[in-house]
Each structure stands twice: as structure tokens, then as C-alpha cells.
């Protein structure tokens, strides 16, 4: 199964994270399929940069986000776009 999760980058006591698509059997910092953005929790306010189109594409393909990534993607507005796409597909099927 393919997951969307965080991989830790940065140096000791100064982490930042990449949001990546990875096979769930891989290690946390192992090889990943594609990078979707990054998250820096240390900055005030935090920095969140997500390629929304890529994230939507992977979610529609069936990639499962971790709970933390799900919360971050919700803040970035990814799930609103996914819902819109699913609604338009249902309307097209019904007509």
C-alpha cells in the first residue's frame, strides 16, 4: 500500500519534514516515490508548502495519508479539492 507521510530532514533539534509518497514497508527516512512538499514546525508561524495538484492526484489513486499528514493536507485545502472532484464525477455518472 502507498502512504503519504512525513520524512525527517534537518539537523539535531532543528527538524523539518518533507511530505512524501512512499511504500508503507519502507523506513521512515528511506527511498520515496515522490515529494509533495515540506513542513517546517520550528518557524513562527510554521511553514507548510504542498503541491496541491500532486497531492489530490495521489489521494484519488488511493494513497493513504498518515494522521499527521491528513491534518496538514486539510489545512492546505487538499481535501476540499478532492471532495469537489468526487462530487463532479458523481453528477456526471448520474446524468
Curated annotation (Swiss-Prot):
GO cellular component terms, A-Z: cytoplasm; small ribosomal subunit
InterPro entries documented for this protein: Ribosomal_bS16 (IPR000307), Ribosomal_bS16_CS (IPR020592), Ribosomal_bS16_dom_sf (IPR023803)
A single MF term (Gene Ontology): structural constituent of ribosome
Domain of life (superkingdom): Bacteria
Keywords carried by this UniProt record: Ribonucleoprotein, Ribosomal protein
Spans through the membrane: none
GO biological process, one term: translation
Gene3D superfamilies associated with the record: 3.30.1320.10
S-S pairs: none
HAMAP family attached to this UniProt entry: Ribosomal_bS16
Family per similarity comment: Belongs to the bacterial ribosomal protein bS16 family.
Protein name: Small ribosomal subunit protein bS16
UniProt lineage: Bacteria, Thermotogati, Thermotogota, Thermotogae, Thermotogales
Amino acid at each position: 500500500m502507498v502512504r503519504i507521510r512525513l520524512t525527517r530532514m534537518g539537523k539535531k533539534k532543528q527538524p523539518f519534514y518533507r511530505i512524501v509518497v512512499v511504500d508503507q514497508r519502507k523506513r521512515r527516512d528511506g527511498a520515496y516515490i515522490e515529494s509533495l512538499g515540506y513542513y517546517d514546525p520550528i518557524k513562527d508561524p510554521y511553514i507548510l508548502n504542498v503541491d496541491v495538484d500532486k497531492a489530490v492526484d495521489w489521494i484519488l489513486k488511493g494513497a493513504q495519508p498518515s494522521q499527521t499528514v491528513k491534518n496538514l493536507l486539510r489545512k492546505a485545502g487538499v481535501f476540499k479539492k478532492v471532495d469537489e472532484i468526487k462530487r463532479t464525477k458523481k453528477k456526471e455518472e448520474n446524468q
